[in-house]
Structures are given as C-alpha cells and as structure tokens.
Amino acid sequence: MMAWVRRWQALALWRRVLVGLFAGVALGLLAPAATAYIAFLGDLFVRLIRMLVVPIVFISIASGVTALADPRKLGAVGARTVALFAFTTACAVTIGMAAGLLVRPGDGAAIGTGEAFELGEPVPVYDQLMNIVPVNVVEALAAGDMLAIIFFSIAFGVATVLAGEEGRPFAALLQSATRILFRLVALVMEFTPYGVFALIAVAVAQNGIAVFTNIGWLALCVVIGVVAQIALVHVPLLVLVARRQIGRFYRAAVDALAIAFATASSAATLPVALRVAMEKMQIDRGVASTVLPIGASIGKDGTAMYVGLLSIFSLQALGVTPDLPMLGIVLLTGALAAFGTAPIPSASLFMLAAVLASVGVSTAQTALVIGFVLPFDRLLDMTRTVASASANLTVTAAVDRRALAAGPPDAEPTGAATPVEES
C-alpha cells in the first residue's frame, strides 16, 4: 500500500490532477448518485482557494513593487522597460477580453451547482473610483475589497521603497513572506487532485459530458489571444520601435519560444532568452541582462491576456452581461493583477479573484470557476507562456534600439530579478 502512495506522490502534480479529472468524469457518468458523498471534498478545496486569495494579492503586489523599485533597476533603461511592459500588458488584457466577448466560451458553462448568480445593486462610477481608496484597511482586507487591496498594496510598496534604508528590512520581510506563501500554495495544491475529482464528478453528474465543451472554446480563445497579441502588438513594436526584420527576429527567437512552450516556465526560458538576445539578436549585453530579468518578473503578456479572457469567461458562465463601466474596471484591475502576479504556479487563476471581486463577484463564485478550469490549466499555461516569452524579447529589442540612440544604458546590468514560473 505504501509503495502505491509513494508512486502516486512521485507523479507530477499536473499528472495527478488529470487522474483526478478522469476519475471524476467516470464517477459522474457511472454513479451520479454517489457524487453526493464526495461533494464535501470540492467544497473544502474551494474554501482553501478562498483562504489564499487576499494574502496572494496583497503580498505579491507589495513585494513586487519593492523589488521593481530597486534604484539599480530603474534607470533610464529600467524606466523604458517598465513603460513598454505596461503597454503590452494593457494590450494583452484588452485582446483577452475581446476574444472572450467575440467567441463567448463561457455561455452555458456548468459552474458549481448551477445556481443563478446575481450582481448586487449597480454602484455609480464615481463611487467605484472613490472606493479604490480604503477608509479602513483592515476592513478592506477582511471584506476582500480587491480594488482597495490593490491600491493599498501598491501604496505600501512605494512607501517601503521611499523609506530607504529603514524600509529595507520590511522589503526583505515581504520577499520572505512571498516565499512562505509559495510554500503554503504548494501545500494547498497537493489537495488539487481530490478537489478536482469531486468538483468534476458533481458537474458531470448534473450536466453530462457537455461540461467540457466550454473548456474547448476557452482553449481556442487562448490560442487566438496569443496569436493576436504577437501579431497586433509585438510585431508593430518590432517594426516601428526596434526596427527589426520580423522573420529574422522570430527565427532567432524560436529556441526561447520552444522552451517557453515546453516548460511553461519563465525560469527555464530566461537563460535561453539571454543567450538568444546576446548571440543571435546581437542585443547589447547590458540591456539584455537588465531587461530580461525584469521581464521574467513583470513581463507576463500571456498571463494578462488570460486574466482578461478568463474574467469574461467567468462572467458569461455566471450569467452576467458586462456593461462598459464593468469592462473598464476589468481592464484596469486585470492589468494591475497581471503586472503583480505572484511567483507561484497558476497564480493567474488566484489573481482572477482580484478582477472579479472588483465587479461584484464573490470569492466563492470565483473559486468555483478556478476549480472548473484548473484541471486544464497546464496545457493552457504552456500556450500562453509563448506570448510572455515573445514579449520579453520584443521589449528587450525595443529598449536596445532606444538605448543605442541615447548612449550606454545607465542602469547596471543585473540578474537580480527572480525568474518565475509563468502563471
């Protein structure tokens, strides 16, 4: 028996999740009545996810600001890098939202119990903007007011940097808290196969095999979003700003893009991207060693596109028709959430709560969406990481062009930014 347990634990988590997925489908089809006895596993998994949402949003964004605002990283080269990544991130969220609105992958999705979801009374735009600034920070954290939490996290991170030497110990504490949070998420993720087993079994028992149709449409939207992000955002930057020949650029980048797809990991892609940038693209070593590590931390076009797409998917699945103010809030919070995504596996799914909460969706409903999508996230992650790898090399080439025109970069080459797994 113990040998089987050890073999089970030795399997990669995504493989165990797939086993739980197939087992849940089988149980839901063959013994739908039995799903009532294992539904508590899905409920427990949802509660564990809800437990993580607020700490992830606050700690990851605050620590991200303190790390990014290192003066060594924010010279002229660093400032241009952040500006370009902010632009590509906003474009990526917009493209993801557009793909979701056009294809409508969430229509008819069987989320949780299938109970209708209703938004509360609409909040005027003025009040929504004013509510971004929390009157009581503790109350905002307890209530899961994500816009207020994001604002306070950014302000807290900036204040920590402005404190100088006195703020360094707390900045180190935030970095340590991020690593501890990573371990906590890893522990919760060990329960994922069982939570997925229960959630999928219940969904299949109630709705049949048609429950997977929406995932197919979602996967199609991810592919459309990645292609659109590269064609409509990266290619124009390469032509107009970096002055690069497109075919030659992507032939040089193919090694880094292949590693990004195969590993779904910025950590594995960064060394290859550095070699490609300096040897094949002839990008200045100082620029490459400054921009690419920053990009590994904040250059997540794939995540941004996915957060925008998944937000629209979730609203459609919950039967909510977004209006223009709601779409504007999704765009703003989606860009901020993607920019501050924590260095943890599938973090984009957890940051989804920050986006949906800003338009009135509860963390319980968001957790059900996460449980619905999570079994398939590995394959989707591989695809969207390609967009992030392309963005990192595109921005590096664009910054290199401007750096050559302005003279030597005034930022010290640094590899201090921690490469992270794409999420």
Question: Which residue stretches match the model-derived regions?
Answer:
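Membrane-interface alpha-helices at helix entry/exit sites of multi-pass transporters
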Residues: 73-80, 183-190, 280-295, 324-325, ...
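Juxtamembrane helix-boundary/capping and inter-helix hinge elements in multi-pass membrane proteins
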Residues: 32, 66-73, 79, 108, ...
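Transmembrane helix-bundle signature of multi-pass membrane transporters/permeases
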Residues: 44, 48, 61-62, 81-86, ...
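Transmembrane alpha-helical segments and their short flanking loops
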Residues: 308-423
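Short, Lys/Arg-rich, polar N-terminal cytosolic tail immediately upstream
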Residues: 1-11
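Alpha-helical membrane segments and immediately flanking helix-loop junctions
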Residues: 250-307, 335-349, 376-398
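Signature of multi-pass transmembrane helix bundles
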Residues: 8, 14, 18-21, 25-28, ...
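Membrane-water interface of transmembrane alpha-helices in multipass transporters/channels
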Residues: 34-38, 75, 173, 209-217, ...
